[in-house]
């Protein structure tokens, strides 16, 4: 069977087009495959770079683990620019050389250094040692109590401002008059009268650092621990100056010294002697003020009461009727009252301190909640005072008198 010439030409042309299409398809597939391989190669290269980085980090960590530990020592004496006498942590003393990486100016008696295990050469000077317990005593966040939140203590607030706040804020006033600012103040009075509250207000009103210490925290079991903690607290205060040290319940560490031979009493006395030395030591304290509080002034050691240690002793006494009224106004400021005469409440709440009056306000609110009311009546305050007074009668407290007074 024969085909026309045009038909044969078309067949040949179609064959050529099909062949060309197959070639283009193969080329496109190859180009796509090459592109995929290039992308895969880039991913592999990135992974390879990441693995190399991790490998370098692991090598450095491994090298650190292979480095032998250094020996700790303390400088006893500096012989010359390149030699020093060191007491090692293992016990004996050594005359050692300084590494070329150590600045001779940093080598002073008492400095902590690192020694090479083999040659005992000084390879590093460590920063001064700080007691973590003393560091934890610094209050980072200031209390939210101001002098406006304290009622009935206007004279005491004035006195504590003159002793603590004024020297820190306006030291030039004392320079003009030609006197040395007072160093510290002792607050004493019955529990609940606002001694700790005053210290919180001082911390709020001043921009100084605030270190709070409870007297019992300075009493330690082993010999020298309490004295070391006292030194570290004052060292921290100097570094953070201007600074205020508040020692609450100071009678725990500053009670009268006796002839007792028990080990615990002797350690408390050592701590007290270190406290006395820090309060009026050879070195100036700078802008470091001390506030102490106690409700047992009768058992304090006379040595700590003399001027130069506590220049002003302030009694935080029981509030009078006007003082109780001020305190009640502060505590009832946000309370929903109806028909309540605070002056009458202040008269009824005789012999109550600030903490008692705060408890009275809380109890009055609880009585209102118990009766499903959204406001507080006068009867609620009467019942609250009766309840708090009954508790006070069960555990009465007679305030000891401080025979030595000045300031």
Swiss-Prot record:
GO molecular function annotation: ATP binding; ATP hydrolysis activity
Coiled coil regions, renumbered to chain: 22-67
Protein name (Swiss-Prot/TrEMBL): Proteasome-activating nucleotidase
Protein family (similarity comment): Belongs to the AAA ATPase family.
Predominant cellular place of this UniProt entry's protein: cytoplasm
PROSITE patterns: AAA
Superkingdom as given in the UniProt entry: Archaea
Database matches in SMART domains: AAA
Gene label: pan
One GO BP: proteasomal protein catabolic process
CDD domains: RecA-like_PAN_like
Domain remark in the UniProt entry: Consists of three main regions, an N-terminal coiled-coil domain that may assist in substrate recognition, an interdomain involved in PAN hexamerization, and a C-terminal ATPase domain of the AAA type.
InterPro entries assigned: 26S_Proteasome_ATPase, AAA+_ATPase, AAA_lid_3, ATPase_AAA_core, ATPase_AAA_CS, NA-bd_OB-fold, Nucleotidase_PAN, P-loop_NTPase
Function: ATPase which is responsible for recognizing, binding, unfolding and translocation of substrate proteins into the archaeal 20S proteasome core particle. Is essential for opening the gate of the 20S proteasome via an interaction with its C-terminus, thereby allowing substrate entry and access to the site of proteolysis. Thus, the C-termini of the proteasomal ATPase function like a 'key in a lock' to induce gate opening and therefore regulate proteolysis.
Subunit structure, as described in the record: Homohexamer. The hexameric complex has a two-ring architecture resembling a top hat that caps the 20S proteasome core at one or both ends. Upon ATP-binding, the C-terminus of PAN interacts with the alpha-rings of the proteasome core by binding to the intersubunit pockets.
Record-linked Pfam families: AAA, AAA_lid_3, Prot_ATP_ID_OB_C
CC terms in the record's Gene Ontology section: cytoplasm; proteasome-activating nucleotidase complex
Alphabetized NCBIfam families for the sequence: PRK03992.1, proteasome-activating nucleotidase
List of residues binding ATP: 192-197, 331
Source species: Methanococcus maripaludis (strain DSM 14266 / JCM 13030 / NBRC 101832 / S2 / LL)
Region (Docks into pockets in the proteasome alpha-ring to cause gate opening), start-end ranges: 405-407
Record keywords: ATP-binding, Chaperone, Coiled coil, Cytoplasm, Nucleotide-binding, Proteasome
Locations listed in the record: Cytoplasm
